[in-house]
Amino acid sequence: MDISKMNRYTAPVNFASLPLLTTFLCGVGLLLLATFTMIQVTSTKYNRNLLKELFIAATSSVFLGFGSVFLLLWVGIYV
């Protein structure tokens, strides 16, 4: 297996777009986290909706997770 004959790996995301992706994904994740927190603080035990809370929490966690990955790539920690 000759390494000089192998194709060079190119990243699926352009490095110039990492700051924008990080800012957008973390911003949306934090906005959803704030929404989830406000729902928890202002709702009573009679008007809570479990599916809505789970959906907002899961969506926030996905956005913050991908935002964190792109933040690590942006600062040079290649995961």
Curated annotation (Swiss-Prot):
GO molecular function: oligosaccharyltransferase complex binding
Pathway assigned in UniProt: Protein modification; protein glycosylation
One GO term of the biological process aspect: protein glycosylation
Membrane topology per record: Multi-pass membrane protein
A UniProt-annotated Pfam family: Ost5
Keyword set, alphabetical order: Membrane, Transmembrane, Transmembrane helix
This protein's record includes keyword Kinase: no
InterPro entries according to UniProt: TMEM258/Ost5
Gene Ontology cellular-component terms listed: cytoplasm; endoplasmic reticulum membrane; membrane; oligosaccharyltransferase complex
Superkingdom of origin organism: Eukaryota
Parts of the chain that traverse the membrane: 19-39, 55-75
Compartments (UniProt record): Membrane
Family: Belongs to the OST5 family.
Function text: Subunit of the oligosaccharyl transferase (OST) complex that catalyzes the initial transfer of a defined glycan (Glc(3)Man(9)GlcNAc(2) in eukaryotes) from the lipid carrier dolichol-pyrophosphate to an asparagine residue within an Asn-X-Ser/Thr consensus motif in nascent polypeptide chains, the first step in protein N-glycosylation. N-glycosylation occurs cotranslationally and the complex associates with the Sec61 complex at the channel-forming translocon complex that mediates protein translocation across the endoplasmic reticulum (ER). All subunits are required for a maximal enzyme activity.
Subunit structure: Component of the oligosaccharyltransferase (OST) complex.
Name this polypeptide is given: Dolichyl-diphosphooligosaccharide--protein glycosyltransferase subunit TMEM258
Gene: tmem-258
